[in-house]
């Protein structure tokens, strides 16, 4: 498992340079709400993000809230904005949708192209209702997050892929990006870099996927990659966790960044 994680981490660094976006880091006291479906409801990737902040910035408390519900589409999310999401009083709101919105079984039916177009138009119409609500939140920073992919290419036993489903998802991600630009919101994409990692490793192992045994729900490795990509968009990749320099003769810290050095003793 450790070796696999190291390999995936290396793949992240080589596969994501072209997909990097800019999301402002969270600030002290902020309330970060992640709105989404079952992938968010699982509670992993945003808890990893929170853990990063807690361990790297222990004196800068933030609150992270899980706003995911399994099976949700943009239509469902819009219906629960007031009673659920806005009730959490977000200062930053991450918005992810598309997996359920894009549909499933009909992609293997007689008219997959027509079905994909229908679900795309339906999803955009539903999202636009949320977009209107978000515009009325002057004190809330909106971050559009392109969803993790539906993995059509992994070879899984007894699991026939819904061909071109992820193409519909990618169109929705592109619309999210355009919406963010139009409204001066922030945007980052999980779909493209995770797809690139999947396809890179599937060249050697066709059964490899970050998207779980159902092609939809990322496993723990997948959630760790999602957290990495989000933190990368916030500008943290490559930054030192802590840095210190000690003068042994003087028994004192010459340099201490993001850490505290005390009780220095010299032997010999």
What are these regions (language model features)?
Residues 1-22:
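Bacterial Sec-dependent N-terminal signal peptides
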Residues 30-44, 70-73:
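Catalytic nucleophile-elbow at a beta strand-turn-alpha helix junction centered on a G-D-S/GDSL motif
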Residues 21-32:
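Membrane/wall-proximal cationic-aromatic binding patches
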Residues 66-68:
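Conserved residues in the N-terminal Rossmann fold of short-chain dehydrogenase/reductase
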Residues 257-260:
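Extracellular or exported targeting regions of proteins
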């Amino acid at each position: 498992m450790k070796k696999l994680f190291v390999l995936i981490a290396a793949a992240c660094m080589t596969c994501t340079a072209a997909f990097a976006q800019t999301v402002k880091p969270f600030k002290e006291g902020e309330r970060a709400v992640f709105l989404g479906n079952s992938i968010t409801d699982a509670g992993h990737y945003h808890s990893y993000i929170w853990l990063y902040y807690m361990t790297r910035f222990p004196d800068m408390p933030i609150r992270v809230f899980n706003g995911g519900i399994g099976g949700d589409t943009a239509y469902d999310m819009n219906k629960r904005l007031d009673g659920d999401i806005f009730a959490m009083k977000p200062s930053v709101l991450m918005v992810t949708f598309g997996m359920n919105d894009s549909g499933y079984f009909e992609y293997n039916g007689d008219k997959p192209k027509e079905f994909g177009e229908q679900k795309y138009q339906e999803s955009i119409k539903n999202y636009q209702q949320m977009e209107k609500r978000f515009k009325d939140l002057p004190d809330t920073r909106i971050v559009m997050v392109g969803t993790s992919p539906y993995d059509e290419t992994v070879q899984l036993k007894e699991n026939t892929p819904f061909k071109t489903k992820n193409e519909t998802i990618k169109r929705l991600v592109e619309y999210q990006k355009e919406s963010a630009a139009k409204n001066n919101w922030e945007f980052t994409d999980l779909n493209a870099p995770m797809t690139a990692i999947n396809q890179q490793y599937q060249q050697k192992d066709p059964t490899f996927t970050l998207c779980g045994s159902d092609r939809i729900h990322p496993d723990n490795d997948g959630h760790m990659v999602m957290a990495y990509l989000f933190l990368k968009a916030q500008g943290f990749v490559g930054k030192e966790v802590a840095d210190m320099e000690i003068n042994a003769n003087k028994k004192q810290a010459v340099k201490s960044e993001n850490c505290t050095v005390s009780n220095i003793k010299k032997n010999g």
